Structures are given as C-alpha cells and as structure tokens.
Design a protein with these regions (language model features):
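Long, mid-chain structured domain cores
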Residues: 94-237
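Conserved small/polar residues in nucleotide/adenosyl-binding loops
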Residues: 239-241
C-alpha cells in the first residue's frame, strides 16, 4: 500500500463527491440495505449528486426491472452488469444534455448476500460503477467481487458501505492510476474484513490497462491469495469455480 497517500474517511470522500457539481448518478443496491448511498446522504449536499436510489429486493420485482438470470442467481456478475447497463441507460434517456451540459453521469450498483443467521454461508457481493470522466466521454466500467470474512451480518453491511464509497471515489479521482484505484478500495478497511478476488476495468479511460496484470496486483497487494483468468484472458472470481 502507498503509505504516503492521504486516506480520507468515508464521510470526507462522500462529501467531496457531493460538492462536485459535475457528478450526477444513480445508486442501485440489492441485498445489504442501502449502505453505500447512506454515506452520501449523511455527508450533506447530496441533492445535486444523487439522481435516484433504488433497492429492488423482491425477486419478481427485480426480474421485472433487470430481467431474469439464467441460473436463478441474484448475486452474480451478470446481475451487476445488467444493473449498471439499465440504470446508466435511464440517466441518458431521462436527463437531457441541453439542461446538463457539464454533468458526468454515473451508475453505481451492488448485489450482496451477507452471512446467514446460522453462519453456514459466508457473505459475498458484486460491486460496479459505470461512469464518465468528462461530460463528452464514453462511459467506463469497474466491476469487482468481494468475499466478506466478518462473522456478523451488520458488520458486513457496514463493510459494504465503505467498499462502495471507496470504489466510487477511486473511479472518479484515481482512474488515471488504476493501481491506486485498487489500493484505495481498502481505505479504512483491512484484509480481515474482506477479500477482493476479482476486478475488471473497461472503457476508454482504461484502454491501456491489461486486466490480467491488474488482477495480479490483487495478489501482490495482499488483497487475495490467488486470481483466475479464463482462456480468453478475462478475469474470473473464485466463485465462478
């Protein structure tokens, strides 16, 4: 980790984003409350940043919005991809550039399963953000998978909130330095709380990023013990195995 980098609290990060008048987006969270967006509401100044929040908890209602999953799973990579695509598309459809010529749109999403009551299944989740680096740029995406190690659902919810804030902040303020995006994911968190075992960055801002090498940074930085690639070079989570 970069010991010289100043680590901001979740409130400080959320407030800086809220005070940036050009950032504007949607938060869609499933499975662990609205733990990410609450940081932005509590920080203050969120009215110009948050276009909408949504938590489609009921499976039938969620399917009506994002479509059904082939294997019936709701905490999976394809779900996060659909959530990002749908929510970002709605912003472009409903908010005209004539009225908001300088806005950088974004859609944040997570789909999470926290540890169950009997502690027989560990919590995990998919997190993603689709975002612009300028009002005229094509969007980029960052998607990651995390496994939670805490033995309490409430603690895992709190970790979910912190990780989401770190991802959003890193996307906007560190996108030119992908390794720093990774490092910042653990701001105010540690390996005992969660393990990030997959990350994928795509879009014009990451045109020079080799995602396989980026995933190896997860091991190098101590975020996970191993990473997996598909035959075509795509990053996979251990949960795919």
């Amino acid at each position: 980790m970069d010991l010289e980098r100043v680590i901001l609290s979740a409130k400080q990060k959320a407030l800086r984003i809220n005070l940036n008048q050009d950032l504007y987006g949607t938060f869609a969270e499933i499975g662990a409350g609205q733990e990410v967006v609450r940081h932005f509401f509590r920080a203050g100044g969120a009215s110009g940043t948050i276009a909408k929040t949504i938590s489609a908890y009921d499976k039938d209602f969620s399917d009506a919005i994002y479509g059904k999953e082939a294997k019936g799973r709701y905490v999976c990579e394809s779900r996060i991809d659909k959530m990002l695509e749908h929510e970002y598309g709605l912003i472009e459809e409903r908010i005209t550039r004539d009225d908001h010529p300088t806005k950088q749109y974004f859609a944040f999403a997570n789909t999470v399963a926290t540890i169950n009551y009997h502690k027989t299944t560990q919590g995990h989740g998919w997190f993603g953000i689709k975002f612009q680096t300028s009002a005229t740029s094509e969007p980029n995406t960052i998607v990651l998978h995390a496994r939670f190690h805490e033995q309490d659902a409430l603690l895992q919810q709190q970790t979910t909130g912190m990780l989401g804030v770190n991802l959003i902040y890193g996307a906007f303020y560190f996108y030119k330095r992908p390794k720093e995006v990774l490092q910042s994911l653990y701001d105010n968190l540690d390996r005992d709380q969660l393990e990030i075992d997959m990350v994928q960055m795509n879009g014009p801002a990451f045109a020079d990023v080799d995602n396989r090498l980026l995933s190896l940074q997860l091991v190098k930085q101590g975020m996970t013990d191993a990473v997996i690639f598909s035959p075509d070079g795509r990053n996979l989570s251990l949960i795919h195995i």
